[in-house]
């Protein structure tokens, strides 16, 4: 698979006299079409890392390559057009008086012709299942709907990469599921590369790979199965465990012989049913 993002020994400090860097010797590669989750407790450097990928921050040292282009002041705007970001608070992202006006805002800034703009807005709203709300005021939407509109605004720009920077952290479980299912659908249809910056372990379970940050350093990377199987280590890093792992731990304490490998909620349900039927 062709790499779309490459980071090599990235270092960054917010202030020159900071004793601890926000990022320290971070290196990894993301392939085109992958879904990557970056997890870590507050202050681990995960959001700083996201901002170096799209050029909001330029690293003090190291190399960032996006789409085979090295991030520097000369091509920073080209790279930013390749990367769309959805932030934590949807209310801080709206500038239009209606949903369709808001989705069109970024297109207007890029000078997209009106005829093409109308097509892109309609297409983006259909992809996030919000077409029927096109003339609605954003303030009258639920949290999950607002984030879906924010995603539509990014999708309309047709980036190669979408970064979700704690995009579900302020939503209730229903809104969170709305956003995750929307991203899954768009990724499958458009072969987008998705980077999810999150502390929500259940959200991270949707990724192809997970990167674990601690105090500015990349300390682990692997598939959800590989990462979540190291339960005690995650707890030591200040992270939670996915629900299936918590359930397995509780069953084990009651003397139930449980599988050692990580299981999704769906696989856990199947295993429980099989265990009951085989008794």
Curated annotation (Swiss-Prot):
Record-listed ATP binding positions: 40-47
Localization recorded for this chain is: Cell membrane
Q: What is its EC number?
A: 7.-.-.-
The record's principal subcellular location, in a coarse class, is membrane
An MF annotation (GO) of this entry: ATPase-coupled transmembrane transporter activity
Q: How does it sit in the membrane?
A: Peripheral membrane protein
Query: Keyword set for this entry?
Result: ATP-binding, Cell membrane, Membrane, Nucleotide-binding, Translocase, Transport
- Taxonomically, which superkingdom? Bacteria
Q: Does the keyword Membrane apply?
A: yes
Q: Pfam families annotated for this entry? A: ABC_tran
- Residues in ABC transporter domain copies: 5-240
Q: Which GO terms describe its cellular component?
A: ATP-binding cassette (ABC) transporter complex
Coiled-coil residue windows: none
Spell out the subunit comment: Forms a stable energy-coupling factor (ECF) transporter complex composed of 2 membrane-embedded substrate-binding proteins (S component), 2 ATP-binding proteins (A component) and 2 transmembrane proteins (T component).
The free-text function statement in the UniProt record for this protein reads:
ATP-binding (A) component of a common energy-coupling factor (ECF) ABC-transporter complex. Unlike classic ABC transporters this ECF transporter provides the energy necessary to transport a number of different substrates.
Q: Which family does it belong to?
A: Belongs to the ABC transporter superfamily. Energy-coupling factor EcfA family.
This protein is called Energy-coupling factor transporter ATP-binding protein EcfA
Organism, scientific name:
Enterococcus faecium (Streptococcus faecium)
